[in-house]
Amino acid sequence: IFLQAKERGGDHYDFDAAYAAMQGYYDQFDVNWLNQETLVNDEFAASGYPMFSTPGAITDTLYNLGFRVFSLSNNHSYDKGAAGIEASMAHWAAMPDDVVTMGFYNLSTYDNYAYQTVNGITFGYLSYTEHTNGLPTPSGAEYGVVYLDDRETIAKQIADMRPNCDVLIV
């Protein structure tokens, strides 16, 4: 899809046409969650299988469609190592204030939690992955994923977040 977006955009990536059929659909919902299956950033060249990197322009399109909640923890989270995690986190941090991400956790504390209040309802979000395609937590990484088999960390995160939200989405 990024190759088509580059062809359409010329000197930039234009993802709008790929999602044109969905324009307006998500307006009917108060909360729109998307599992972002690849690292998003402009530090690494766009790449597909087997080590993915998606151009940052995708988030403009997704934002304009109405997505505000993005899960970042998945099997491709470590595709570009610690630098990929940092680049992706920096990209998401530059998004508008109403964007919420979860899935990359501080590896020392695992307590950088994501909350969002919509129509007076506070949502808490957690995101996990089953595996990272055989890639270990990158050396030197400050942030990383929590694996589904890490029941102790997951239980602690759920217990920490429950009192602070009306709805907890895991």
Please name every model-derived segment.
Residues I1-V170:
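Acidic, metal/ion-coordinating pockets
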